[in-house]
Amino acid sequence: MNDVPNRPAVPRPPGYPADLERDWHTADGTVVHIRPLRPDDLESEIQFVQGLSEQTLYLRLQYSMREVSRADAERLLAIDYHDLMAIGALVDEPQGETIVGVSRYARIDDSDRAECAIVVTDAWHGRGLGTELMRSLGIAARARGIRTLEGTSLGENQR
């Protein structure tokens, strides 16, 4: 996203796929920055997970723990952009970029399959963001030789 005007350049980690950065517009015109997450997103990742409702945590991630330790968040951001990928949806807020959704994949062994998960903060449900995150994750996976994304969803998850 360093190609977006008025946005400061942020150092990218080795192997960072800048080609996956782009802006997406919701139906109401809100700009959402779609990009791979980076280690410097640590505080935003912690706030994102802690801001999810218990229902969203349970339906999307099958657990209800709302507290995330710094070490847990660091593990979530320890991605290599090949076998492990995390794509974030971020919006500009007065305090900086805020994560409002994340899609992830983890390659299964050394195969062309990966497990995936998507979670969107409650305020953004029903706006097409989950679909857009899945589309972005699919593009990233395909470019890295992953042909199948597998995910688990609870039956009561109707969103």
Name each region found by the language model.
Residues 1-159:
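Long, contiguous binding/interaction regions
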